[in-house]
């Protein structure tokens, strides 16, 4: 007999009127083991350049009916790209807007993954004790050791990052100083921080989570309501081109901007980023 899982969002008792994804949506879109593979970098980077991760520091995203979606950074979208980059020789630092700890969507953590979970445990302190982004931005110059900025996905990227002047300054520095920018799924919402000033990403093409898919997820209880705005629409208004309208695990390179469409693209994006950065810094 087939057991039917509920499509009702699950209550998050830590906050009033807040909800996790439904049992059904978790059964469809999460797994206890990731699809990590292809981690093969026989000549890793040995220098000082590293990755700056701009992580989410807020958990609750309001929806159109007043209910809160309990979110953060998606673990797969965060950890798989970093696993590849770390294996390729690039260390990383974590920063949040507030300097407070990174929020993760723990309901998507691959708890039985024998490679990803030890990697997370090894680096958990970086996420628990991040730098304050404003302090990082204040120290940026042409000689800074950051080779890339990485903005992980998860709906937590919709909270605060799109309005942050510090995010804008970090992205402007990266593009103008020929550094890589890496992101996937909802992470490119951070690019909206550039829309009210100098926008060096005007004309760039990316992969990202489609607005059309976000409009469907409440039907299966992934979110407890609809979003109040859609980041893809806003990115297009600021001159960016989203090349995908579906979710296939697609990745894309436009100059030094590397992007992926969803958690299904996390492993491929990690490979792409590691290969591109090795070619640039370890060649």
From Swiss-Prot:
Q: Does the keyword DNA damage apply?
A: yes
Task: Name the GO cellular-component terms.
Answer: cytoplasm
A GO MF label = zinc ion binding
Q: Induced by what?
A: By heat shock.
- Keyword Nucleotidyltransferase attached: no
EC number in record? 3.1.2.-, 3.5.1.-, 3.5.1.124
Give the gene that encodes this protein: hchA
A GO BP term here is:
DNA repair
Q: Which organism is it from?
A: Escherichia coli O157:H7
- The name of this protein is Protein/nucleic acid deglycase HchA
Question: Which PANTHER family does the annotation name?
Answer: PROTEIN/NUCLEIC ACID DEGLYCASE DJ-1-RELATED (PTHR48094), PROTEIN_NUCLEIC ACID DEGLYCASE 1 (PTHR48094:SF20)
Q: Which InterPro entries would you find in this protein's record?
A: Class_I_gatase-like, HchA, Prot/Nucl_acid_deglycase
- Domain of life, source organism: Bacteria
Q: Which reaction does it catalyse?
A: N(omega)-(1-hydroxy-2-oxopropyl)-L-arginyl-[protein] + H2O = lactate + L-arginyl-[protein] + H(+); N(6)-(1-hydroxy-2-oxopropyl)-L-lysyl-[protein] + H2O = lactate + L-lysyl-[protein] + H(+); S-(1-hydroxy-2-oxopropyl)-L-cysteinyl-[protein] + H2O = lactate + L-cysteinyl-[protein] + H(+); N(omega)-(1-hydroxy-2-oxoethyl)-L-arginyl-[protein] + H2O = L-arginyl-[protein] + glycolate + H(+)
**UniProt entry keywords in alphabetical sequence:** Cytoplasm, DNA damage, DNA repair, Hydrolase, Metal-binding, Stress response, Zinc
Task: Check the UniProt entry and state the signal peptide residues, or none.
Answer: none
Q: Family per UniProt? A: Belongs to the peptidase C56 family. HchA subfamily.
């Amino acid at each position: 007999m087939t057991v039917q899982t509920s499509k009702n969002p699950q209550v998050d008792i830590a906050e009033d009127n807040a909800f996790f994804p439904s049992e059904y949506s978790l059964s469809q879109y999460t797994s206890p083991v990731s699809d990590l593979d292809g981690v093969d970098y026989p000549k890793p980077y040995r220098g000082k350049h590293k990755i700056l991760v701009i992580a989410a520091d807020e958990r609750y995203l309001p929806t159109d009916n007043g209910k809160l979606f309990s979110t953060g950074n998606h673990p797969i979208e965060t950890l798989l790209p970093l696993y590849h980059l770390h294996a390729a020789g690039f260390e990383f630092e974590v920063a949040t807007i507030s300097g407070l700890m990174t929020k993760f969507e723990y309901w998507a953590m691959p708890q039985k993954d024998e490679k990803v979970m030890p990697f997370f445990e090894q680096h958990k302190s970086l996420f628990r004790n991040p730098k304050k982004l404003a302090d990082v931005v204040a120290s940026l110059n042409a000689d800074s050791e950051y080779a890339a900025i990485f903005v992980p996905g998860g709906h937590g990227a919709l909270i605060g990052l799109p309005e942050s002047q510090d995010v804008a300054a970090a992205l402007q520095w990266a593009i103008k100083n020929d550094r890589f920018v890496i992101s996937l799924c909802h992470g490119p919402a951070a690019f909206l921080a550039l829309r009210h000033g100098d926008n060096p990403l005007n004309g760039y093409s990316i992969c990202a989570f489609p607005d059309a898919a976000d409009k469907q997820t409440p039907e299966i209880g992934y979110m407890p309501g609809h979003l109040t705005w859609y980041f893809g629409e806003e990115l297009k208004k600021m001159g960016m081109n989203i090349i995908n309208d579906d979710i296939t695990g697609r990745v894309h390179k436009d100059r030094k901007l590397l992007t992926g469409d969803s958690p299904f693209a996390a492993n491929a994006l990690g490979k792409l980023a590691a290969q591109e950065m090795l070619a640039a810094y370890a060649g």
